[in-house]
């Protein structure tokens, strides 16, 4: 869903255009747009928008958590309508930033259309011009200036639907650098099986050390310490990374039961405080001494 408003927030800003796209059980897509033709029609607009939002099992927006949802909630309060029941809300802006910011920088929706989805809108309007177009319509009654605003709103919700589809089955279409970011995003969401599949694909494509590191992190999170150790050990041969040595030292000590190798990594520097490193070194030296003692006849 997406809104067009008379301002950037606050009690005086009004939603004058609401757009929502949803899918029916047969896979058909439906787009509904609600236009506030005059201020006195705000109540029915909010009522119908509330019906559409309440019927959704998942809300999808682009910066909607910070802007669209709060302004709709404020307008409902101002019109003495009850608050809507909470719904799961996927804000694609946060997903896009995690996935694409390293490659694209700014993550405007039109940027994603061009560089991720591969298309460019035709005639469009900058968001900063939208309120003045609506003000002109209220003064003159001429709807022609609103045509591009309505199309802009429709494009926004259609693009969100396309992004949801892309992120659902992304591996063949995402650039290599975005695969690593997607794996990290799945890991943060604790979708570890999906994270592992994406990380495996990134490694298979030869994305590089970043893919190997995230795959090791995911393996560790899944409890597959043997796989994590393999990936971290391969990285440690190429990288001078104190944090990586710390992860590997822990795995050698507690999983592989190789305190000598863990001690070597600790002495090489693990980025810990001096006190923590000293405790780790002392503990490992005791384990090595006990192991030697048990081997003596």
Predicted regions and their residues:
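Conserved DEDDh/DEDDy metal-dependent 3′-5′ exonuclease domain
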Residues: 28-111, 115-119
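Acidic, Mg2+-coordinating catalytic module of metal-dependent nucleases/exonucleases
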Residues: 104-180
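TPR-repeat structural position
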Residues: 143, 192, 225, 258-259
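Residue at a conserved register position within TPR or TPR-like alpha-solenoid repeats
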Residues: 186, 215, 219-222, 252-253, ...
């Amino acid at each position: 869903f997406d809104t067009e408003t008379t301002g950037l927030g606050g009690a005086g800003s009004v939603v004058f255009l609401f757009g929502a796209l949803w899918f029916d059980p047969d896979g058909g897509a439906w787009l509904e747009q609600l236009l506030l033709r005059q201020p006195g029609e705000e109540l029915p607009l909010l009522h119908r928008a509330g019906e559409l939002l309440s019927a959704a099992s998942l809300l999808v927006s682009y910066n909607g958590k910070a802007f669209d949802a709060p302004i709709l909630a404020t307008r409902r309060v101002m019109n003495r309508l009850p608050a809507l029941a909470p719904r799961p809300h996927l804000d694609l802006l946060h997903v896009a930033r995690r996935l694409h910011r390293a490659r694209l920088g700014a993550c405007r929706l039109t940027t994603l259309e061009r560089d991720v989805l591969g298309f460019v809108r035709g005639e469009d309007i900058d968001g900063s011009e939208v309120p003045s177009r609506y003000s002109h319509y209220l003064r003159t009654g001429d709807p022609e200036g609103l045509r591009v605003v309505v199309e802009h709103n429709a494009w926004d919700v259609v693009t969100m639907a396309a992004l949801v589809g892309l992120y659902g089955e992304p591996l063949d279409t995402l650039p290599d650098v975005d695969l690593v970011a997607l794996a990290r995003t799945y890991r943060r969401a604790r979708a570890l099986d999906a994270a592992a599949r994406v990380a495996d694909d990134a490694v298979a494509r030869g994305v590089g050390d970043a893919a190997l590191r995230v795959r090791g992190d995911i393996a560790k999170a899944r409890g597959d310490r043997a796989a994590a150790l393999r990936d971290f050990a391969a990285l440690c041969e190429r990288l001078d990374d104190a944090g990586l040595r710390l992860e590997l030292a822990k795995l050698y000590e507690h999983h592989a039961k190789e305190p000598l190798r863990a001690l070597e990594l600790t002495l090489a520097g693990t980025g810990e405080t001096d006190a923590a490193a000293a405790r780790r070194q002392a503990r490992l030296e005791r384990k090595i001494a006990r192991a030697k003692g048990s081997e003596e006849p």
